[in-house]
A protein has these predicted regions:
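Short, well-structured segments within or immediately adjacent to enzyme catalytic domains
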Residues: 1-192
Length: 192
């Protein structure tokens, strides 16, 4: 029997358990329904961009099945203990948003070739650890701490076509990485 108290099921502060790299996470809506956000936003379609047409090959053979989630949360939002990524301000409550809620993104549509857990790691002005999605004519969605959302047009070929072999453009990669970096956290170490 499952414990229906999400706080007990998430000892590591992960907003949504499971992984999108294996079959049991692809279609398991219980992972979303038991997530820490579901009691506030209890509609499954909200957790997947409608433009995400990616499927993952079924372990039973044949075609693919759609994944249930394309959404990931900034790794600086209530991070795992000891997993603050080593630099930057972590956010545990609204008053922690030193950049201001309108300049701090919370969730992002993550590229289907990059999405694994519930976190989106971004801590560099020069490149990406996890890659944003580009479902909307090379653009992807983000939500911010003040409640607004944005569709960001990505310039980098690496972001636009992640998961395919493409040549990167360091200048364009840096433009996209810096744009997201400036809206991620206050990096307290002199990295800029």
């Amino acid at each position: 029997m499952r414990d229906h108290n999400p706080a007990k099921n998430y000892p590591l502060n992960q907003w949504c358990m499971g992984t999108m790299h294996e079959a049991r996470g692809w279609t398991n809506t219980i992972l979303i329904q038991d997530s820490l956000l579901y009691k506030y936003v209890n509609s499954l379609p909200v957790y997947k961009c409608p433009a995400d047409r990616a499927t993952t090959r079924s372990p039973w053979g044949g075609g693919g099945i759609p994944k249930v989630r394309s959404l990931a949360m900034s790794c600086f939002m209530n991070p795992l203990p000891g997993e603050s990524r080593g630099r930057g301000k972590t956010y545990r409550k609204q008053s922690d948003f030193v950049l201001g809620p309108a300049m701090t993104w919370v969730t992002i549509d993550e590229n289907p070739s990059s999405i694994n857990d519930g976190w989106f790691v971004h801590e560099s002005q020069t490149g990406f650890v996890d890659y944003p999605a580009s479902y909307h004519n090379n653009a992807g969605g983000l939500s911010f701490a003040d409640g607004h959302s944005e569709i960001k047009k990505w310039k980098s070929p690496a972001v636009q076509t992640f998961g395919k072999r493409v040549m990167t453009n360091p200048t364009l990669d840096r433009l996209d990485a810096t744009w997201l970096y400036d809206r991620t956290t206050d990096f307290t170490q002199p990295w800029r």
